[in-house]
Amino acid sequence: VVVIETHVEFGMKPIIVPYDPNYMYPGKHPIYHGASPAAMNILARNKGYRLVVTNDLGINHIYLRNDIALNEIPEIEVATTLTHPKTIASFKSFEEIKDWEFKEV
């Protein structure tokens, strides 16, 4: 089991903020760090894990290795985890940083 916090503000864009060894929160902007849910899902799949559940806001993703309980615990799609009204409202905050440097995965 792997639990990963993501930035739902990034929406379904498969992006990450480039690593900065000197980063200290809040940095240039409170949400300018980390990775999107879509980016983390790509990483997890590449490592042999599947998304099985998130918290209600879609921030905390819980992944399970693909060789464990595959029939009992099915994979869910990232898009289905980003439907809470607060999560949808948070997408607006990405507008403030949308033109900053990101890496697509």
Please provide the spans of the model-predicted regions:
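Conserved beta-strand signature within the Rossmann-like core of class I S-adenosyl-L-methionine
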Residues: V1-V8
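Rossmann-like AdoMet/SAM-dependent catalytic core
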Residues: K13-V105
